[in-house]
């Protein structure tokens, strides 16, 4: 295996995980903050808000998992070799 390809794959894997985590991290923080604010304003809607929050957090976390899958593919099943 060419050392340049190996080094580029490791760097790309790190960038894939890092960049794939930024957006969902910001989104999850914003969503949780807005959910807490919504529950504070309207406590009787707490169950509905919490259910919607958990579903949306799962969808956001899926984006990070996709980045991890790409990184693992670059590290262990390198298509450039």
From Swiss-Prot:
Similarity field: Belongs to the ATPase C chain family.
Record GO cellular component, one term: proton-transporting ATP synthase complex
Keywords: ATP synthesis, CF(0), Chloroplast, Hydrogen ion transport, Ion transport, Lipid-binding, Membrane, Plastid, Thylakoid, Transmembrane, Transmembrane helix, Transport
Residues carrying the site annotation Reversibly protonated during proton transport: 61
Pfam families for this protein: ATP-synt_C (PF00137)
Function of the molecule: F(1)F(0) ATP synthase produces ATP from ADP in the presence of a proton or sodium gradient. F-type ATPases consist of two structural domains, F(1) containing the extramembraneous catalytic core and F(0) containing the membrane proton channel, linked together by a central stalk and a peripheral stalk. During catalysis, ATP synthesis in the catalytic domain of F(1) is coupled via a rotary mechanism of the central stalk subunits to proton translocation. Key component of the F(0) channel; it plays a direct role in translocation across the membrane. A homomeric c-ring of between 10-14 subunits forms the central stalk rotor element with the F(1) delta and epsilon subunits.
Gene this protein is translated from: atpH
Its membrane topology: Multi-pass membrane protein
GO molecular function, one term: proton-transporting ATP synthase activity, rotational mechanism
Isomerase among keywords: no
Organism domain of life: Eukaryota
Any further remark recorded for this protein: In plastids the F-type ATPase is also known as CF(1)CF(0).
Transmembrane segments: 3-23, 57-77
Protein's name in the database: ATP synthase subunit c, chloroplastic
Subunit structure: F-type ATPases have 2 components, F(1) - the catalytic core - and F(0) - the membrane proton channel. F(1) has five subunits: alpha(3), beta(3), gamma(1), delta(1), epsilon(1). F(0) has four main subunits: a(1), b(1), b'(1) and c(10-14). The alpha and beta chains form an alternating ring which encloses part of the gamma chain. F(1) is attached to F(0) by a central stalk formed by the gamma and epsilon chains, while a peripheral stalk is formed by the delta, b and b' chains.
Major localization listed first in the record, in broad terms: plastid
Localisation per UniProt entry: Plastid, Chloroplast thylakoid membrane
InterPro entries: ATP_synth_csu_bac/chlpt, ATP_synth_F0_csu, ATP_synth_F0_csu_DDCD_BS, ATP_synth_F0_csu_sf, ATPase_proteolipid_c-like_dom, F/V-ATP_Csub_sf
Classification via NCBIfam families: ATP_synt_c, PRK07354.1
Organism: Ipomoea purpurea
